[in-house]
Amino acid sequence: MDFEQAVNTILPGKYRHFKGKEYEVLYVAKHSETSEPMVVYRALYGDEDVWVRPAGMWNETVEIDGIEHPRFSRIADAIHNWDDA
């Protein structure tokens, strides 16, 4: 997945991980050495840690009991409007 594809398909908003916890996608960024698209996101639980994950991995599916499921499913629009910050 290239950067433009990642920006157009992984939109800011609230997502649910296949294991049930929720996260907010903040941005799609570029890796400083490889330019690989990376998803910058934060946990919506606990200390609300901020994480990065390769965009290709974000969009992967996982198999559960023989059925393919998205690793992350978008469940709501962006929580914050970072342009107003």
What are these regions (language model features)?
Residues 1-85:
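Mixed-charge, low-complexity intrinsically disordered regions
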